[in-house]
Amino acid sequence: MFLQTYETYNSINDRDLKEKNVVVIDTLRATSVITTALFNGAKEVIPVSEVEEAIELSKNFDRDTFLLAGERNSQKIEGFDLSNSPLEYVPEKVKGKTIIFTTTNGTRALKKVASAEEVILGCLLNVSAVARYISKSNKDTVIVCAGTEGKFSFDDILTAGAIYEKLKSLTDFESDDLSKASYFLYKPYENNLYDIMKYGYHLRRLEELGYTEDIKFCLTVDKFDIVPKLKNGIVRTSQDF
């Protein structure tokens, strides 16, 4: 098995995905939100790239069956039901609902890799579950970091490093240099990831906007034992497909 990591979704094309599993990471916050929503009982999440696309898609659903959710520039979209804060996705709001979801980085990354044979979602909240899934599949795997506004982001590459660390204890594999670098960046800080993530632009911006509790939540390791999976444009837990 070979593990390859891309620092943003902008640097990948369909040829890179052929016959490979893909893990999309957007720890702050899209893949953390989707993982939380599904764990808390959401029926499914439909990621879309644009706000207008989300609104148009919602017209196909009865109003009591869906939620419009997401952000632009880290802020809730006007007229939407939920923002991009995982703390909002509690069972009493999301259970049984279809969530139509659009974000600046994460949902666009998911759309970019949708042609891959298998796409799963990773974050710190489910890092061990993701590593086990990769190990059992025993297929070449591409980790795609969503990044922030098309640029490298600490939170995603450190999560890639956490997956690498968990995978090391499960199976033998080869990897590219960025996968190794993500591991060596992660390892000294594995017990306090905030100590390095605090230097990242994205985390600092979220703090400035008042999302400190979101950050604490998203930096929790192995809170959930589920693996969200994208298939035919819809994300459900892997066992639901």
Swiss-Prot record:
The family database entries (SUPFAM superfamilies) matched by this protein are listed as:
ComB-like (SSF142823)
As its record notes, the protein acts as a catalyst of: (2R)-O-phospho-3-sulfolactate + H2O = (2R)-3-sulfolactate + phosphate
Cite the GO molecular-function annotations of the record. Answer: 2-phosphosulfolactate phosphatase activity; magnesium ion binding; sulfopyruvate decarboxylase activity
EC id: 3.1.3.71
Entry keyword annotation includes RNA-binding? no
Cross-referenced NCBIfam families, in alphabetical order?
PRK00886.1-3
Record protein name field: Probable 2-phosphosulfolactate phosphatase
Q: What is the lineage of its organism?
A: Bacteria, Bacillati, Bacillota, Clostridia, Thermoanaerobacterales
